[in-house]
Design a protein with these regions (language model features):
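Short acidic alpha-helix that forms the nucleotide-activated donor recognition element
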Residues: 61-64, 221-232, 254, 268
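Acidic donor-binding loop of glycosyltransferase active sites
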Residues: 230-244, 257
Length: 339
């Protein structure tokens, strides 16, 4: 199959990594897969089999010759419909119209979702959200993930414990400011710990002034992230329900990292019973959950055992199996039947 993924940006992010993983797995199966993006190829991802075309979508040769075109963000849907050939899909990793940061363009986002595409969802809850907003049915394909890359040796006993918090602090979706506020509260109570932060963006003035962060890592390459997880003792994932899928939380579970996660559909889908949950957006509850893990070694050990098998249930090859079936079925439906 000639498959094209339309990528809005090659900047480091979990959503971009998911797209590149899907493309690479399908290319390894013999399909002609091209990622088309107006930006240079990402240096942080080891791309081996899939092709990369740096081009405006309107001028893309691969898109003009595609059998399957996959939009991966709301801004790429219209180009996929306008310039793609064959069957057009829309890979949904979160419903952008519900994000506070996209409120000024929410009407444009809804218009993009109304365009004639076959929708793909990472989770059952996201499928429900799309249906509730009038965007029709979506196929749940699951999350592309390689748990083996994050396998970690037993953590040494060390004090103080280090807490890893991932994501951009600006904006509501990731809940990072909720998490940092909770950690500041715990520091004020005299709890001893270190805070490790990782984000694709520079340290913000707000976070610097808060003064709770001990180490800040910017734009860590995908192949270096496992080592950062191994340096931590706890993972804090405070994202809000609008977040379609929290990839760092899954990576933390695969790394045997005890996790305190917000009680959202995405986290329940990825973590099951392998994490300690707290109400999303509740700074006091976040502080209590983190304090529990800081003080309870046995609970940390229990969650560390549960994480890897749970994360191992998400496999890129399973996602590729589903995509191949959907792509072939859609392409057959697009082609006129023989007389």
């Amino acid at each position: 199959l000639k498959i094209v993924y339309l990528l809005a940006s090659s900047v480091l992010s979990g959503g971009t990594k998911v797209v590149l993983q899907q493309a690479e797995e399908l290319a390894c199966r013999g399909h002609a897969v091209t990622v088309v993006c107006p930006e240079p190829p990402p240096s942080w991802f080891d791309r081996r089999r899939s092709a990369y075309e740096e081009s405006p979508f309107s001028a893309s040769r691969a898109l003009a010759e595609s059998e399957i075109a996959v939009a991966t963000f709301w801004t790429t849907v219209e180009p996929a419909v306008s310039f793609g050939r064959g069957a057009i899909f829309h890979l949904c990793q979160g419903y952008e119209a519900s994000f506070e940061g996209y409120a000024p363009v929410a009407d444009r986002i809804r218009d993009a979702y109304r365009l004639p595409t076959r929708k793909l969802s990472l989770t059952p809850r996201l499928r429900e959200v799309l249906f509730e907003h009038g965007h029709g049915e979506a196929e749940v394909i699951g999350q592309a993930f390689d748990a083996a890359a994050f396998a970690a040796p037993p953590r040494p006993a060390r004090e103080p414990l280090s807490i890893l918090l991932a994501g951009i602090d600006e904006g509501e979706v990731k809940g990072v400011r909720d998490g940092l506020a909770a950690l500041a509260t715990l520091r004020g109570r005299g709890e001893a710990f270190r805070v490790l932060r990782v984000s694709p963006e520079p340290l913000s003035r707000w976070e610097r002034d808060l003064g709770v962060t001990d180490e800040y890592h910017r734009a860590v390459a995908a192949d270096r992230m496992p080592f950062l997880y191994r340096r931590a003792d706890l993972f804090l994932g405070p994202s809000h329900p609008e977040d379609g899928f929290d990839l760092p939380a899954l990576e933390a579970l695969a790394s045997s990292l005890p996790a305190a996660l917000s009680d959202t559909p995405a986290h329940r889908f990825s973590a099951g019973a392998a994490a300690l949950f707290f109400p999303s957006g509740d700074v006091g509850a976040i502080a209590e959950a983190v304090q529990t893990l800081l003080r309870d070694r046995r609970e940390r050990e229990r969650l560390a055992r549960l994480g890897p098998p749970r994360a191992g249930a998400f496999r890129t090859r399973d996602v590729a199996d589903r995509l191949e079936t959907l792509f072939r079925g859609a392409l057959a439906a697009e082609r006129p039947s023989s007389p």
